């Protein structure tokens, strides 16, 4: 959201306020790199939650045996459906359906029309949504709304003499993250509909996207009354485990190249330096390790030169894209690092 805040008033002649200062100006050149970073971070979080939801065991697949209707969960799932609709609508506005069809599967587009398809493990995991509380639909809704906002800002962003569609669609990483984001929106709708008792939100438009959501709701409701062939989820065993594993592997390979260069995905407040790399030893010339800092993992090495420990400068990729942090947050992180380091290795050489 700090990036959205930084780009909100870029095109307006308004002075900065007194409460906060954006770290840098988002220009037409670097905006789409920020968008890819934002999409990648959201896809990683949503897919991690989706996979952990699939690993959750249930006693029975009977929907009546799970918790009863909850108005708060219903409200959040209704918001997820609305967020997915707005995201699909923004995609349809920025890129034509023909362009989207070229790099997506038939689960979302078919014969030039929007189509939302559900899989067997989606039906199985939809019954588990009532057990995890409103946090999971809130996560889906937040990222979908964030992506919609970033794309809406990017309508007027782009290189000179290039429109948004031609410029963005020529980047392979951009096509990959858009495919992953639309997959997140697809299964978010499928997981939210059973919690809403197969009711679509009031006022959902009757356009192609709204009709696709309503058609998916009707098909899932009809599938509820028929035999699906899904066995019990004891021991994490299902009938289509090979297809489900291939599904997660495909999405992981889709966003893996972007994740390696995404700074936001590597943000960790804890330092996990191996304590064995800090011992003094005259027999060891070079001691190497890896440390995790607020702006990513970086190689670290030390050399014993004449009894003095020499530490090489840190190398940080894409340092200019790191999220802003306050001095207080940095001091707390360093304090946590020193405390954990001293506890794990009391005889280590002080930094």
From Swiss-Prot:
Listed name of the protein: Uncharacterized gene 90 protein
InterPro entries per UniProt: Herpes_SORF3 (IPR009823)
């Amino acid at each position: 959201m700090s990036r959205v805040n930084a780009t909100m008033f870029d095109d307006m002649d308004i002075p900065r306020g007194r409460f906060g200062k954006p770290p840098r100006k988002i220009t037409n050149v670097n905006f789409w790199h920020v968008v890819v970073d934002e999409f990648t971070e959201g896809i990683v979080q949503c897919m991690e939650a989706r996979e952990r939801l699939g690993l959750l065991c249930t006693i029975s697949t009977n929907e009546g045996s799970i918790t009863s209707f909850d108005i708060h969960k219903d409200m959040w799932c209704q918001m997820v459906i609305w967020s997915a609709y707005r995201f699909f609508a923004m995609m349809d506005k920025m890129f034509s359906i023909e362009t989207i069809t070229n790099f997506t599967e038939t689960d979302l587009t078919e014969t030039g029309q929007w189509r939302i398809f559900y899989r067997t493990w989606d039906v199985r995991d939809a019954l588990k949504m009532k057990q995890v509380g409103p946090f999971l639909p809130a996560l889906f809704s937040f990222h979908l709304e964030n992506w919609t906002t970033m794309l809406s800002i990017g309508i007027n962003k782009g290189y000179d003499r290039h429109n948004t569609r031609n410029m963005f669609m020529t980047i392979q990483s951009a096509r990959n993250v858009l495919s992953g984001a639309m997959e997140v929106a697809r299964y978010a709708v499928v997981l939210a509909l059973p919690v809403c008792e197969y009711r679509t939100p009031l006022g959902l438009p009757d356009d192609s996207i709204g009709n696709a959501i309503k058609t998916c709701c009707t098909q899932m409701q009809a599938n509820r009354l028929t035999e699906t062939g899904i066995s019990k989820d004891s021991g994490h065993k299902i009938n289509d485990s090979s297809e489900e594993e291939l599904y997660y592997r495909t999405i992981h390979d889709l966003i893996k190249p972007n994740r390696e260069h995404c700074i936001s995905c590597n943000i960790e407040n804890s330092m996990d330096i191996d304590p064995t790399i800090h011992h003094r030893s005259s027999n060891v010339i070079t001691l190497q390790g890896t440390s995790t800092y607020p702006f990513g993992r970086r190689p670290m090495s030390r050399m014993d030169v004449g009894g003095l420990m020499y530490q090489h400068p840190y190398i940080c990729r894409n340092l200019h894209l790191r999220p802003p942090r306050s001095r207080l947050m940095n001091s707390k992180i360093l304090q946590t690092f020193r405390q954990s380091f001293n506890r794990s290795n009391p005889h280590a050489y002080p930094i």
